[in-house]
Amino acid sequence: MERGGGGSGTGSRPEGTARGTSLPGKIAEPGAVRTSQPNYRPQGMEGFLKSDERQRLAKERREEREKCLAAREQQILEKQKRARLQYEKQMEERWRKLEEQRQREDQKRAAVEEKRKQKLREEEERLEAMMRRSLERTQQLELKKKYSWGAPLAIGPGGHDACDKLSTSTMSLPKPTEPPMNKRLSSSTVAISYSPDRVFHVCPRLAPLGPLNPSYKSSPTRNIEKKKATSTSTSGAGDVGKEALSGGEASLVEKVKRGQRTATSLPVVNFGSPLRRCEFSGGIPKRPSSPVISKTATKAYPQSPKTTKPPYPGSPVKYRLPALSGQDMPKRKAEKEKSNKEREGTLAQQAAGPQGEEALEKHVVDKHASEKHAAAAGGKAENSAALGKPTAGTTDAGEAAKILAEKRRQARLQKEQEEQERLEKEEQDRLEREELKRKAEEERLRLEEEARKQEEERKRQEEEKKKQEGEEKRKAGEEAKRKAEEELLLKEKQEQEKQEKAMIEKQKEAAETKAREVAEQMRLEREQIMLQIEQERLERKKRIDEIMKRTRKSDVSPQVKKEDPKVGVQPAVCVEKKTKLVVPNKMEINGLNTCQEVNGVDHAAPETYPQDIFSNGLKPAGGLIHLDALDGKSNSLDDSTEEVQSMDVSPVSKEELISIPEFSPVSEMIPGVSLDQNGTGNARALQDLLDFTGPPTFPKRSSENLSLDDCNKNLIEGFNSPGQETPLNTFC
């Protein structure tokens, strides 16, 4: 629109210009008087139309500008809106990414925590399995020891039967680790030992003597103490490594050694007759494991046959051997358990590796197999005991049932006690493991905190170091900048000084050049002046020579009458307005040695010289001087200064010249010279001449203010201008 408006404006201009050109053409007619008024009206109309057009165009431009501004504001608002939407979208995307990252981190953290918990559970299971395997292995070893405990103590013809009898007697002892099974086995072995079949196979020589039987009977209190010992040993059987470090280990080892020495120190004796042994074979008790069994054994003792032969006499030690072995059995058993526990503790410590675990698993499998076998054997033995107890000495089935129920109750109680102890031990182990895990977690957290603190300290030190390095760099940069600025200022100062020096040098050179030029100009002027003065001097000399020639040619009588001095002088003197006396006196004017020209009037008297040679080196001219009128121009000052006027003057003697004191500057300069030596004739004639020419117009000057080099100065100062001079009467 602006361009269109501009085009319309430009298009309207030629119309206005054409209109303006056509209107003055109509007005400019000959005879039109009022030409100004018709010219003003069309110009005003044209200006009015142009102003309307300009206002319209300006209004259109304003509207267009407002539209453009509104459109631009709308675009800016739309752009801001788009930018805000884009920013919000970016922020939402960023928050979404942050949320996803946080969720991923939470999932990762949860997975790590779950994995850690899984590892802890696996570790707990592994430790529990190890503990269980170690316990099972300990029980298996104790079971093996229980079965292998009855070794042959004597060598004889019935050795195998004795070994079987001893093994069956030892099997009757209850074990602390497996009380139900051992009790069943013990009861079954007791029942078997008292059964007719078993008695039928027993060798009669191994039976002990009758009088020694009461010593082998065990009291109920003794059986209770044995149960307590077995329960305490059972409670300590689960502990793998702690019992090995107990304080009573040395005493137990000593007891084991002492029992072994007593067992090995027993002498081997010969048994009695077979008949006697067979007589006592049915009634000898085999150290029962419970008071009930001992009672049955005592009841069965009197039923032995009396027709048997008396036994051979033997040593009491022989018959006490089973009792001694029965007394030493718990000690040996406890010692073996302690040694096995120590060995199991070392094995449990070494079982952390995979090979140890595999070996433990193999032992567990073997132990389970042996437990199953032992359980089956125990069940069979229990059944056989239930069947054989009435035949072994119990006549009442109810009493046997009570005994069996009591045994089962005791086995159940012992099993519950062992289970409770096992649970307590597992709980204690779990608490210990949790405590260890808690301590390990605390240690890990402490180490992480220390590492975090160290990392923060390291970062802080690095930041401080970086900050210090940045400060040092900034200071170094500022110092370098300051030095650069100082060097720049110094260079600028040096450059300025150099420029000033160069300017001063240039000024000096210019001054010297100017002085040389001035001196050269003055020298040239002086030379020119000297040449001019020399030329003037030569001209004056020529004129003086001419004057002298004319004066010599004129034949004037030497005797002139005093009464007629004017008549003799008037026809010969033709004086112009100005005369010029040249005295070759040298003086300095503006530093130049020039010859001063002394200008005087016509009536100036010639200088008088008191001596032949004055201080300026000039000699007075002798003879008469005739002043004649010259044909020069007397009205111009240049001619009066440049030309020397000559006149015919009669020669005056030295004395006559000295006799004029009024007008001689030499008289003032040299006051000691007397002027009254000659007569007054010449003075009178000169006075008349001065009266004819007129009085002097220059003032007198004192001799104090004059020097020898300035003797003609009062003449120069007394020089009158042409307007002030009086015209002289010249005689033609």
From Swiss-Prot:
Checking Pfam families in the record gives: MAP7
Coiled-coil segments on the chain, per record: 51-146
The entry lists its GO molecular-function terms as:
kinesin binding; microtubule binding
The listed locations are: Cytoplasm, Cytoskeleton, Microtubule organizing center, Centrosome; Midbody; Cytoplasm, Cytoskeleton; Cell projection, Neuron projection
Q: Where is the composition biased (Gly residues)?
A: 1-10
What's the reported outcome of changing A32P? In a breast cancer sample; somatic mutation
Q: Does the keyword Transmembrane helix apply?
A: no
Q: What is its main location?
A: cytoplasm
- Give the range the annotation lists for the signal sequence: none
Q: Please note every region of biased composition (Basic and acidic residues).
A: 49-64, 329-345, 359-374, 404-509
Q: Which organism is it from?
A: Homo sapiens (Human)
Where are the residues of the annotated region Disordered?
Answer: 1-64, 95-123, 157-186, 210-244, 279-509
What is the protein name given in its UniProt record? MAP7 domain-containing protein 2
* Entry's Gene Ontology cellular component terms: axon; centrosome; microtubule; microtubule cytoskeleton; midbody; neuron projection
One GO BP on record is: axon development
Record keyword Cytoplasm present: yes
Please describe what this protein does.
Answer: Microtubule-stabilizing protein that plays a role in the control of cell motility and neurite outgrowth via direct binding to the microtubule. Acts as a critical cofactor for kinesin transport. In the proximal axon, regulates kinesin-1 family members, KIF5A, KIF5B and KIF5C recruitment to microtubules and contributes to kinesin-1-mediated transport in the axons.
InterPro entries, alphabetized: MAP7_domain-containing, MAP7_fam
The protein's UniProt keywords, in alphabetical order, are:
Acetylation, Cell projection, Coiled coil, Cytoplasm, Cytoskeleton
Family note: Belongs to the MAP7 family.
